């Protein structure tokens, strides 16, 4: 029994609780087996060492006894179980836990999203046809959406935000009357002749076509009393040019 207590004390400092219980269970089994064999074991002679102290000093055939084999088997089982558990915990996942796996996936997602945004930002803009004229700056070489004078949608009162006179199309929101004018300006409207409300153009384009012709009819008289630009200036707005 002293050997069992010594084994339990030494094992408690080395093995985990689950392994310690397994060791105690195997030790109890070995104790019962040893008591069964002690009934048939001859009495030791005077001066001979006790069986516990003579452990490992016997003959080779004694080392192969059931008691020695049981202790060796239990020791090897514990070693094998410990190595197997370590390999399972170490090889369960390269990230170590589910949280690390989630963090790894999120970082990969951010990495690929950054690559996608970068590729879209570097995508070159399509070149317009040679005869295309931008409706904002009246220059060729780019579309209206790529114009350096373009403002965010909804910031201006009119589509055109430049300083030149342009051709505008109007539609009264009250009476649905439509008209066009060659004296359209940025952020300036014209009064509806029927409803007498100021209407801003919903479409504006340059006066000159690619062939150099004016799209407006210069022979028509401009109603200055309906033009907001003329009211602000105090004189005929076309005189600015």
Curated annotation (Swiss-Prot):
Transmembrane segments: none annotated. A zinc finger (CCHC-type) spans 132-149. Keywords: Metal-binding, Phosphoprotein, Zinc, Zinc-finger. The modification Phosphoserine is found at residues 65, 93. InterPro entries: ZAR1/RTP1-5-like_Znf-3CxxC, Zcchc24_Znf-3CxxC, Zn_knuckle_CX2CX3GHX4C, Znf_CCHC, Znf_CCHC_sf. GO terms for molecular function: nucleic acid binding; zinc ion binding. Pfam families: ZCCHC24_C, zf-CCHC_2, Zn_ribbon_3CxxC_2. This is Zinc finger CCHC domain-containing protein 24. It comes from Macaca fascicularis. The gene is ZCCHC24.
């Amino acid at each position: 029994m002293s050997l069992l207590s010594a084994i339990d004390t030494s094992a408690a400092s080395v093995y985990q609780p689950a392994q310690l219980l397994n060791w105690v269970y195997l030790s109890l089994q070995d104790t019962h087996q040893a008591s069964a064999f002690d009934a048939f074991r001859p009495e030791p002679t005077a001066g001979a060492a006790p069986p516990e102290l003579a452990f490992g000093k016997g003959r080779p055939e004694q080392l192969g006894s059931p008691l020695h084999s049981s202790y060796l088997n239990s020791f090897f089982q514990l070693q094998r179980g410990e190595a197997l558990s370590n390999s399972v915990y170490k090889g369960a996942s390269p990230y170590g836990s589910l949280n690390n796996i989630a963090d790894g996936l999120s970082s990969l997602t951010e990495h690929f999203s950054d690559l996608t945004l970068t590729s879209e930002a570097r995508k070159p803009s399509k070149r317009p046809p040679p005869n295309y004229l931008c409706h904002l700056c009246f220059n060729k070489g780019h579309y209206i959406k790529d114009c350096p004078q373009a403002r965010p949608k909804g910031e201006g009162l009119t589509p055109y935000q430049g300083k030149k006179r342009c051709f505008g199309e109007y539609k009264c929101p009250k009476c649905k009357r439509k008209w066009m004018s060659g004296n359209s300006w940025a952020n300036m409207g014209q009064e509806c002749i029927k409803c007498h409300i100021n209407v801003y153009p919903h479409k504006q384009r340059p006066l000159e076509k690619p062939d150099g012709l004016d799209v407006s009819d210069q022979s028509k008289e401009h109603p200055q009393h309906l033009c907001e630009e003329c009211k602000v200036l105090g004189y005929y707005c076309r005189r600015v040019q």
